[in-house]
């Protein structure tokens, strides 16, 4: 019995039985990215080919949209803290549905496309922190990793299937595609309106003891670690396409992406308990080592290297992204929604830095005729930058903690992988 308590429940025992609202929320975690990825991955092609925008303008629009979608999560978390989780998800879906309807109208009035795209990204920014917080609301500590992993698996499944369904129709029948996605989001919005609220728990009840600023109570180490993880991972996300298509084909690039999605869908739920119990320092070491190994393997440029590198990078980010979220929840005194919003901001900052700095480095490698060096340099950063987190960890550990408020503090056993109740 003692061993079972230490190891925690298995995946099946953690997830089941599922209540009706949680079943619907997990289904929505699949349907929402399914609809979104029927459209968003093709926006550069749609804006350029169908609406005639210049590539420079397209790049600026997509960069602005990505920044809103990631970094706006901190506003979504704060809004959920103020008006409640269900209301925030509902308003976010209304905004996002309006965005997809706007894309349909943009076929008649092209300038509307930019604002419609921004609306969809604003909706995503508002929705995700509240969605994650609702998913783990009232769930005991040992089951939280399983629920977060199941939500991530559903999200990645939707991201994988959406482009496969929509690819043939983006340029040939975009009107029908946008109408179908808008209808899907309308249905999901109606379903969310029927979810039970969590406001009875008083989402703002901690305001008297916790400052209400957007970054107040941030768990600094998981925040910085998340920004660094996304910075390094997005070297792969941003630049694999041009590298893989050049050395293999666009079809093979799709195979690599499908492998990565499949690994997240299958491995993260199964490994969630192990990741929860893993000491934080060990999880960071394992995750960044996986990223380093995968990025280094990509430098070979062969088809086998693309598959192996993608797999190693995905396994590394499975550990890093989940563990950083769990540690942020454990260390911060803020509500779950605010914590997820803060972590989303960190992800946005990291992804943005990767696009700016990584783009310059990849351009240098391309001009020199040795783009393989780009991946080796990225791998070296995976080994050289994470040790700087140790300095931050020691500095945070020395910070005094007021009596009676130790939940977000670093303690002597802060790496035991526990996710305390909130």
Name the predicted role of every residue range:
Residues 16-66, 219-256:
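Helix-loop boundary and gating motifs at the non-cytosolic
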Residues 72-84, 170, 266-280, 362:
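Helix-to-loop junctions at the C-terminal end of transmembrane segments
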Residues 117-155:
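Cytoplasmic helix-loop-helix junction between adjacent transmembrane helices
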Residues 183-201, 388-392:
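C-terminal membrane-cytosol helix-exit motif in multi-pass small-molecule transporters
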Residues 337-366:
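A late C-terminal transmembrane helix in Major Facilitator Superfamily
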């Amino acid at each position: 019995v003692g061993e079972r308590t230490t190891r925690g429940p298995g995946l099946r025992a953690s997830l089941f039985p599922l209540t009706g609202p949680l079943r619907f929320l997990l289904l929505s975690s699949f349907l929402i990215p399914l609809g979104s990825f029927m459209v968003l991955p093709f926006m550069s092609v749609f804006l350029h080919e169908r609406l005639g925008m210049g590539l420079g303008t397209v790049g600026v629009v997509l960069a602005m949209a990505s920044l809103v979608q990631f970094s706006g999560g901190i506003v979504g978390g704060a809004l959920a803290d103020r008006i409640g989780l269900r209301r925030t998800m509902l308003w976010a879906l209304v905004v996002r549905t309006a965005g997809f309807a706007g894309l349909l109208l943009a076929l008649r009035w092209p300038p509307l496309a930019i604002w419609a795209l921004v609306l969809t990204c604003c909706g995503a920014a508002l929705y995700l922190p509240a969605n994650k917080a609702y998913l783990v609301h009232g769930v005991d500590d040992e089951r939280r990793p399983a629920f977060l992993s199941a939500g991530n698996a559903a999200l990645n499944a939707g991201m994988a299937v959406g482009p496969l369904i929509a690819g043939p129709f983006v340029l040939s029948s975009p009107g029908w595609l946008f109408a179908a996605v808008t209808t899907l989001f309308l249905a999901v919005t109606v379903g969310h309106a029927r979810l039970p609220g969590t406001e009875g728990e008083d989402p703002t009840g901690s305001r008297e003891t916790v400052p209400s600023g957007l970054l107040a109570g941030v768990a600094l180490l998981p925040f910085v670690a998340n920004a660094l993880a996304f910075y390094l991972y997005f070297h792969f996300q941003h630049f694999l396409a041009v590298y893989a298509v050049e050395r293999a084909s666009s079809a093979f690039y799709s195979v690599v992406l499908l492998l990565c999605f499949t690994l997240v869908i299958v491995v993260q739920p199964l490994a969630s308990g192990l990741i929860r119990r893993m000491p934080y320092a060990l999880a960071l070491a394992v995750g960044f080592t996986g990223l380093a190994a995968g990025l280094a393997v990509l430098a070979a440029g062969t088809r086998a290297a693309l598959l192996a590198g993608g797999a190693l990078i995905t396994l590394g980010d499975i550990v890093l992204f989940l563990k950083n979220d769990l540690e942020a929840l454990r260390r911060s005194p803020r509500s779950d929604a605010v914590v997820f919003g803060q972590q989303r901001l960190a992800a946005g900052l990291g992804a943005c830095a990767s696009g700016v700095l990584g783009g310059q480095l990849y351009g240098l490698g391309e001009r020199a005729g040795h783009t393989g060096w780009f991946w080796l340099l990225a791998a070296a950063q995976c080994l050289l930058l994470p040790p700087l987190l140790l300095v931050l960890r020691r500095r945070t550990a020395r910070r005094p903690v007021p009596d009676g408020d130790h939940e977000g503090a670093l303690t002597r056993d802060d790496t035991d992988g526990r996710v305390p109740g909130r």
